[in-house]
Each structure stands twice: as C-alpha cells, then as structure tokens.
C-alpha cells in the first residue's frame, strides 16, 4: 500500500504540461480522422506521412506546393487545439525522425533530430554525467514539439527552452533547408511558433552537469508564497529546481499550498549511487485515484491530503537531476465517453500572485468548474520569442480541468476559461498557447503584444500558408 501511495503521489504532481496522443500510421497513410488527447476537435485529414529520411520530407513539401495542400507537423502530439493537424491536409509525423546525431562532452552540447524525445536524450547523456538544462516536467515530448511551444519546466536558473538552443535546421515552405541561429530573424518566430514556419529537422542544444539534489518540502498559505519564493528559493543559489501546488479541494480551496525545492546536495561525489534512470510505476493505482477525484469531492480532498503528506514525508530524500526531470506520464491517458481532461496554463508576475489568487478564487466561487489540480512553477522574464509568455518574472499555474463532450459543456468551460484569462491579464499576466483555443483574439493580443509582428513574419516567410493549423486559423 505504501508503494502505491508513493507512486500515486508522484504521478499526481506531474501535470506540468501537455498530454499524450500517438498517431498510428505507416510510412504514408491515406485519409483518416485525427484529433488530439482532448478528443474535442476530430477532423478528416488527407494523409499522414511518417518522416524518417530528410529527402522524403523535402519531397512531401514540394508535392504539397504543387498540389496546393496544407501541411501540419506532429511530434508526439501533446498539444490541444489542433496545433498539429488541419482538415484535408498532410500531417508530417516526425516521431520516426529521431536519431541522436552527436554529443560534445567538452562543450556540453548535443545535436538531435527533431523527433527524438527528452527520454532519448536523457538515456544517451546520463552515462556521461550530463543532463538537460530546460524541458517540461515529463520526458515524453519530442524536441521539435518542445521548441515549437518554447517549453519550460522545474528548473529555475536556465529560463525557457529558447535560452538553451544553439541552432537548428529548418525545412522551409519552398523546400529549401537553412540553418537558423539566435541572430537570425526566424529564430524567435520558429521557437514558440507551433510549426507555422517550416519543419525543424535537427537541433543543437546546450546541456549541463547532472547533479545530486535533496528534496525539501513545506506547507504554507498562499499569501506568503511570493515573499517565501523571493527570499528562500530564488535568493538561494543552491536551490536548482522548484515545484508548488495549491489546493483545489473544497477544504482550503486556493489557500493551502505546499512547495518542494530541489537543493544541491553537499556530497556530489555520491551522484553515481542515484543516477540510474527511473521509469513509470503503479499506473493503474494512480488512474483509479484520479478517477475518484474527478467524480467526488471527498476524492479530491483525499487526493490533496495524500499528495501533501507524501511529499512532506520525503524531506531529505536524494535524487539526481535527470530523475527529477522524468516525472511519470502514463497515468495521463484518460478515456471516457462522456468527458475529457483539458489543460490551461496562466502566467502571473511573482509580485501579483497573492492578489491574483484572491481574484481567481472569487471568479470561481460562482462557477461549476471541475478543477482537479493546479501545479505551480517559476519562469524568469524572457521576451526573446515573438510569442513570449514571460513578460516578467512569472509563476506558471497549470490547471487540470475535466469537461464534458456536449456542446453545452464545452461552451460553458470555454466561457469560464475566458473569465480566468481576464483575471490573469488584469494582473499583468498571460496564458500558454498550446491548449484549447478558447481565448478570444482580443485576449490573445493582450497577452501577446508582439503577436501581430509574429503573424506578419508568417505572411512574409510563408505567404501561401503552406504550413497550417487551427491555432493559426483562429488567431491570424
């Protein structure tokens, strides 16, 4: 029982990002229906092309130009909102384009094809004592997809993913391949650009040293969190990673919190004893517990109490950097004929957190939203990407929401999400773009003031809109 509770608590804390959906396809698959993990936007596509060789990708783009067919790009397909497919279009499935091309141990860089996952990189570099700088909490995402969303994670020292990219090669709409570096105009558009400028072929990323951390967890009230973070987390150079949770249970709703810091251990010479990479365990028990949380208020209360008790009991536990960045993921696979799980993510300036939570609580007090979980991370100010979400030092709040399939349920969830978005914008915040496109165009432009420049680049570099998805259709 103790092991099941342990696995359950670990798994339920991993909502940092984006859900999983895999396309079943051969090298080329004719017309079929495609959707994402939310199952809210099924459409008929013309063809899925599983890219394994560069020449095949080039030929596909040229053929699409000749026949005037739209192209969308899919990695592991974890985004929601139709970012990776388009009706009657070609989907390039990049998951087979996944080789590790080179590793420079001295410079701490790695070059990989875009269909490789973070798990592939971790397994390759772990024996050399190296680790990823910035990635999502889970390692199931492809590198190309992560660049396209400009991912972030638990690390609080290295910023967003864009800060760790040395260069990448891009297959453009005209069938030509170019190398893109930080000095190039396309660099800030492609990273965080959701596949709208071409096919990312391979990427050179900065790595860092694997390290041994000590887990330290404590409870607190939301009103003290901003000051606590500034003084004891950001202000302590030995804290390398950070994760927080705020209660969605009726008891302590949006008030009770606990935080987990990953602090540099004093005895780094013992890292090898902790460097074996962990894998998913006890998925069934975790899914069952989450099912209770979806259906019953007492289940949500129990979920919160169990998570909190477990992590508090782990004070002093030692863990490698690579293993911190391997949160469980299989439990996220959820199928039900009546409802589905969706994510929303809001970014709020650190100094605004307390008043933002008060306003969010007030907003939700008269709403019937099945809000299952909120995890919180830190993202330092970074406005390099054209669609940058971190206009200030921000807290990122990832909300897991269960919603029904009916048109009425979807419309109601969309309405509430727009209300929550207004709250974030009111406090100088923004929201993350890979999820359902429920926000209005006006909200998108408020949250992303450089969006018009981004769309102008799209019109300049891809005037025929060869690369297309529903995100672009919605907000262009």
Swiss-Prot record:
Stored SUPFAM superfamilies: FAD-binding/transporter-associated domain-like, FAD-linked oxidases, C-terminal domain
Gene3D superfamilies, alphabetized: 3.30.465.10
UniProt family annotation: Belongs to the oxygen-dependent FAD-linked oxidoreductase family.
Residues with PTM Pros-8alpha-FAD histidine: 78
Signal peptide span: 1-25
Keyword Hydrolase found: no
Name of this protein: Uncharacterized FAD-linked oxidoreductase YitY
Record InterPro entries: FAD-bd_PCMH (IPR016166), FAD-bd_PCMH-like_sf (IPR036318), FAD-bd_PCMH_sub2 (IPR016169), FAD-linked_Oxase-like_C (IPR016164), FAD_lactone_oxidase-like (IPR010031), Oxid_FAD_bind_N (IPR006094)
Alphabetized UniProt keyword annotations: FAD, Flavoprotein, Oxidoreductase, Signal
Boundaries of every FAD-binding PCMH-type domain copy: 41-210
Domain of life: Bacteria
Cofactor(s) this protein requires: FAD
GO molecular function: FAD binding; oxidoreductase activity; oxidoreductase activity, acting on the CH-OH group of donors, oxygen as acceptor
EC code(s) of this entry: 1.-.-.-
Main enzyme class: oxidoreductase
Pfam families in the record: FAD_binding_4 (PF01565)
Biological source species: Bacillus subtilis (strain 168)
């Amino acid at each position: 029982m103790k092991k099941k509770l342990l696995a359950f608590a670990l798994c339920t804390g991993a909502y940092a990002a984006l859900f999983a959906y895999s396309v079943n396809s051969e090298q080329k698959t004719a017309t079929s229906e495609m959707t994402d993990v939310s199952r809210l936007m099924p459409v008929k596509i013309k063809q899925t092309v599983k890219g394994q060789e560069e020449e095949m990708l080039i030929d596909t783009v040229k053929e699409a130009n000749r026949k005037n067919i739209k192209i969308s790009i899919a990695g592991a397909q974890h985004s929601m909102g139709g970012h990776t497919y388009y009706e009657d279009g070609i989907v390039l499935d990049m998951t087979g384009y996944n080789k590790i091309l080179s590793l420079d141990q001295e410079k701490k860089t790695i070059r990989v094809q875009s269909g490789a996952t973070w798990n592939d990189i971790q397994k390759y570099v772990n024996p050399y004592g190296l680790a990823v700088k910035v990635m999502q909490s889970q390692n199931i995402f492809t590198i190309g997809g992560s660049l396209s969303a400009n991912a972030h994670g638990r690390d609080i020292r290295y910023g967003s993913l864009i800060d760790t990219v040395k260069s990448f090669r891009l297959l453009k709409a005209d069938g030509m391949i170019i190398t893109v570096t930080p000095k190039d105009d396309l660099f800030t558009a492609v990273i965080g650009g959701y596949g709208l400028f071409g096919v990312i072929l391979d990427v050179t990323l900065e790595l860092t040293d694997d390290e041994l951390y000590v887990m330290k967890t404590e409870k607190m009230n939301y009103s003290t969190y901003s000051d606590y973070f500034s003084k004891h987390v950001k202000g302590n150079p030995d804290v390398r990673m950070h994760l927080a949770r705020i209660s969605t249970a009726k008891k302590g709703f949006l008030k009770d919190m606990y935080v987990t810091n990953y602090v540099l251990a004093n005895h780094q010479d013992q890292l090898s004893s902790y460097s074996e990479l962990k894998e998913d365990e006890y998925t069934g028990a975790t899914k069952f517990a989450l099912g209770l949380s979806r259906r019953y208020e007492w289940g949500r209360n129990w979920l919160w109490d169990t998570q909190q008790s477990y992590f508090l009991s782990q004070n002093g536990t030692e863990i490698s950097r690579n293993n911190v960045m391997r949160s469980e993921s299989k439990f996220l696979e959820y199928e039900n004929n009546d409802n589905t799980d969706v994510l929303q993510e809001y970014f709020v300036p650190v100094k605004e957190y307390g008043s933002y939570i008060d306003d969010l609580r007030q907003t939700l007090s008269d709403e019937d939203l099945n809000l299952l979980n909120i995890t919180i991370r830190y993202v330092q100010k970074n406005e390099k990407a054209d669609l940058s979400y971190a206009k200030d030092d921000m807290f990122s709040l990832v909300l897991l929401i269960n919603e029904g399939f009916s048109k009425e349920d979807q419309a109601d969830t969309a309405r509430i999400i727009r209300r929550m978005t207004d709250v974030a914008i009111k406090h100088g915040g923004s929201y993350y773009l890979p999820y359902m496109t429920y926000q209005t165009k006006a909200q998108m432009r408020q949250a992303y003031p450089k969006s018009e420049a981004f769309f102008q680049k799209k019109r300049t570099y891809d005037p025929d809109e060869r690369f297309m998805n529903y995100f672009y259709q919605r907000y262009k």
